[in-house]
């Protein structure tokens, strides 16, 4: 039971450092270092003296870029010339609208939940500080993450919008309001620790880089200890995941973060041999038969 609870904690961290760096020089003569990541496969972080570059790989289209961000340090913004191409985000950010409960939880652990000014899908957010903010009116209800209240988001004028993208996703009017959209695609990583490592990106955004690095190191150590313990366990509990939505039952692919988590936890999962990194759209009858 203790093992399962601890594994759930690690999962929530991202339902919720390598010191190796490669030095380059940009067009403005700044020294830039590529941060070596231990597990994450779909993100690159390049740190320069006055800005950082974060490149998100498209997990659905191999070899293509999903989004490129240029994080400009506010104190240096007036003196920077020749910025590279990409979505400009001034950091540390001072306010945000967050579409997913998992990111609300992570920002709370990073100590920056006070910078959340609006949320979507409030019924799924169980954090006391978020619920109190909604009651007091300091945090706005922006509706559903599928159909957000765009006008309310615009009225809040946040520095960024954090949401989870989908393949060929279009954000409609939200793309036209001039607010940087942070595409949080960490759920498409192929390991739980790869997914968790994206907190380093969010640490850069919110000005809590050291705290994010420290938290990730704790998660990394804890997860691997639990994995070793789980592999030695003699029992292999079976798991049934998710739930029926209409006529479809979505289950994690065997190569997804959840699928890999089940393997690491030594849990018997019906689709563990599947090779997909996303979710599987299955009939309820098929899932029950498995």
Language-model segment annotations:
Residues 52, 60-154, 161-166:
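A short, structured surface patch at a secondary-structure boundary
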Residues 1-26:
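Bacterial Sec-dependent N-terminal signal peptides
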Residues 250-280:
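Alpha-helical, coiled-coil/dimerization segments enriched in small aliphatic residues
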Residues 19-104, 211-240:
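Bacterial Sec-exported substrate-binding components of ABC uptake systems
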Residues 55, 63, 280-290:
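Ligand-binding pocket segment of bilobal, Venus flytrap-like solute-binding proteins
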Residues 138, 149, 155-249, 272-273, ...:
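Extracytoplasmic substrate-binding proteins
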Residues 112, 177-179, 265:
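Short, structured coil segments at secondary-structure junctions
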């Amino acid at each position: 039971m203790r093992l399962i609870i601890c594994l759930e904690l690690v999962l929530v961290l991202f339902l919720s450092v390598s010191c190796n760096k490669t030095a380059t020089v940009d067009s403005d003569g700044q020294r830039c270092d590529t941060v070596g990541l231990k597990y994450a496969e779909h993100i690159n972080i390049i740190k320069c003296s006055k800005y950082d570059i974060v490149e998100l790989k498209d997990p659905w289209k191999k070899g293509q870029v999903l989004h490129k961000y240029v994080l400009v340090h506010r104190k240096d913004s007036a003196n920077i010339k020749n910025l590279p191409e990409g979505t400009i985000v001034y950091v540390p950010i001072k306010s945000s609208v967050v579409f997913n409960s998992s990111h609300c939880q992570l920002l709370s652990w990073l100590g920056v939940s006070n910078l959340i000014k609006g949320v979507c899908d409030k019924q799924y957010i169980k954090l006391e500080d978020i619920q109190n903010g909604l009651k007091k009116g300091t945090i706005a209800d922006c509706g559903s993450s599928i159909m957000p209240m765009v006008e309310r988001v615009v009225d809040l004028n946040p520095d960024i919008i954090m949401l989870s993208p989908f393949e060929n996703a279009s954000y409609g009017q939200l793309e036209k309001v001039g607010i940087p959209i942070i595409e949080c695609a960490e759920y498409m990583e192929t390991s739980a620790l790869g997914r968790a490592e994206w907190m380093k990106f969010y640490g850069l955004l919110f000005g809590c880089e050291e705290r994010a690095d420290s938290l990730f190191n704790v998660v990394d150590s804890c997860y691997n200890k639990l994995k070793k313990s789980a592999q030695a366990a003699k029992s292999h509990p079976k798991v049934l995941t998710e739930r029926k939505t209409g006529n479809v039952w979505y289950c994690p692919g065997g190569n997804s973060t959840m699928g890999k988590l089940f393997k690491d936890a030594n849990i018997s999962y019906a689709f563990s041999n599947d090779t997909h990194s996303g979710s599987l759209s299955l009939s309820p009858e098929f899932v029950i038969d498995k």
